[in-house]
């Protein structure tokens, strides 16, 4: 049965693909990197999945938060499958709970596997595209986890999905223009109700955010952070990288860029 791992800051992008993948299967939805998420919006997502009938576990794999809870859920769901399959046949078998780990790139799938296995069984990195092939990993005597490369929908043009994935580090920044992405990020933060994070993080007057366009706001951010070249001009590419790093690593504050549709 699949364990679906998606970052809270951009959740919906591969839902259709995951739903098809997990069709007629037991599913545990793991919302990893929960420490980076807007707690109010994260709770809405947790309720959304629970209302759909999915088991939902919030984790912060880097700090091993709720990993034991996740393992307990794997065994609980697996036991239900085995009892349903074998109890009526009066067959006694030693259960092996096999889980497919699926999700978009760079959401911590391999890190969670390593925490569950309590060893470095899967290669990890804070950038997408590191896991290249499927790999079965044994945990104890009763759990087998299949680590898989990240999955993305073929089309990412709906609801700024591609921009959101790039902002949260789920696609490689090398394939996008960093200044354009940073400007899109500024617009998203403002439109999604996170204007105050820009004010607090970069000491920008709120009135300026209303008056300036995103490129000019990025220039202000660059000046505030000392991204200057000779002549006192702002190095816009460097300013963009500062903002993108702050968003990706949660330095700007806790955010969710994909909201639950009520």
Please give the residue ranges for each predicted region.
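Alpha-helical scaffold elements adjacent to nucleotide-binding pockets in ATP/GTP-utilizing enzyme cores
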Residues: 6, 48, 69-73, 115, ...
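Short coil/loop residues immediately preceding or within conserved phosphate-binding loops
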Residues: 94-96, 119, 134
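Canonical P-loop GTPase G-domain recognition
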Residues: 37-102
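Active-site phosphate-binding and catalytic loops of NTP-dependent enzymes
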Residues: 12, 80-88, 122-126
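Glycine-rich phosphate-binding P-loop
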Residues: 98-118, 148
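Single conserved hydrophobic/aromatic residue that forms the stacking wall/gate
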Residues: 1-11
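Conserved active-site beta-strand-loop modules that form the wall/rim of enzyme catalytic pockets
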Residues: 61, 113, 143-146
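Helix-rich effector regions associated with P-loop NTPase G domains
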Residues: 12-28, 34, 40, 54-55, ...
């Amino acid at each position: 049965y699949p364990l679906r791992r998606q970052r809270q800051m951009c959740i919906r992008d591969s839902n259709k693909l995951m739903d098809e993948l997990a069709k007629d299967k037991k599913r545990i939805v793991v919302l990893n990197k929960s420490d980076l998420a807007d707690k109010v919006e994260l709770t809405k997502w947790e309720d959304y999945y629970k209302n759909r009938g999915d088991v939902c576990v919030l984790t912060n794999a880097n700090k091993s938060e709720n990993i034991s809870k996740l393992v307990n859920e794997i065994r609980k769901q697996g036991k239900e499958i085995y009892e349903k399959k074998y109890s009526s046949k009066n067959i006694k078998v030693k259960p092996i709970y096999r889980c497919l780990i699926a999700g978009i790139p760079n959401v911590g799938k391999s890190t969670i596997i390593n925490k569950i296995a309590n060893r470095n069984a899967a290669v990890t990195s804070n950038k997408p595209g590191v896991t290249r092939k499927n790999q079965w990993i044994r945990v104890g005597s009763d759990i087998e986890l299949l680590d898989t490369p990240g999955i993305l929908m073929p089309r990412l043009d709906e609801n700024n999905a591609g921009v959101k994935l790039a902002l949260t580090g789920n696609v490689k920044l090398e394939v996008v223009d960093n200044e354009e992405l940073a400007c899109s990020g500024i617009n998203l933060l403002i439109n999604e109700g996170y204007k105050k994070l820009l004010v607090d993080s970069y000491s920008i007057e709120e009135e300026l955010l209303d008056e300036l366009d995103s490129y000019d706001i990025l220039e202000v951010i660059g000046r505030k952070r000392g991204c200057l070249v000779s002549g006192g001009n702002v190095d816009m590419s460097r300013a963009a990288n500062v903002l993108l790093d702050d968003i990706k690593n949660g330095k700007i504050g806790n955010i969710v860029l994909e909201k639950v549709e009520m």
